[in-house]
């Protein structure tokens, strides 16, 4: 539509459409914590210098809670805010990236019992495991304990070996081998 005024100038109308923006994210690696939440940092592509537009309201989750490398992280609920945000349109409301969940370290504690000489090095130990997250199923197995030699004596070194087992074993690693 054209309109002329008395100065011989012409006016018309047209639209200014919102500029498209794309959000991309980088996820942080984490140690297993029994949940799938992820921490991410986002970046907008396409904002004109001097405009104030930022990403907001995003939540990020790993594909599941378990340990693995290059796990998919989905970022959803993306929106933009800021004084210039009405001039822009976010093209993606969901973004994906990858990150790692590494095993949580466990510490096994052992206490050796005294014994009477019996011509062998085998030892009896009591044990506990620290660091298992409530609700996960982990136990120590294949516990082997041996005195450094079979001779009678005080303050003898006992070497203990063991490994972990249970439904959640793939999310943990035993971080110590023990000499008592």
Predicted regions and their residues:
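Short loop/turn motifs that initiate or flank beta-strands
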Residues: 4-180
């Amino acid at each position: 539509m054209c309109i002329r005024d008395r100065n011989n100038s012409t006016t018309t109308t047209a639209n200014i459409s919102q500029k498209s923006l794309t959000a991309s994210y980088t996820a942080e690696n984490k140690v297993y914590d029994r949940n799938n939440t992820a921490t991410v940092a986002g970046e907008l592509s396409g904002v004109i210098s001097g405009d104030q537009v930022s990403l907001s309201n995003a939540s990020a989750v790993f594909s599941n809670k378990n340990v693995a490398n290059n796990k998919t992280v989905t970022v959803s609920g993306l929106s933009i805010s800021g004084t210039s945000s009405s001039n822009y349109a976010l093209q993606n409301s969901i973004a994906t990236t990858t990150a790692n969940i590494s095993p949580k370290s466990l510490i096994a504690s052992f206490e050796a019992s005294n014994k009477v000489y019996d011509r062998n090095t085998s030892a009896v130990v009591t044990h506990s495991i620290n660091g298992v997250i409530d609700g996960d199923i982990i136990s120590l197995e294949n516990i082997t304990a041996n005195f450094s030699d079979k001779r009678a004596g005080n303050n003898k070194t006992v070497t203990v070996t063991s490994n972990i087992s249970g439904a959640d074993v793939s999310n943990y690693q035993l971080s110590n081998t023990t000499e008592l």
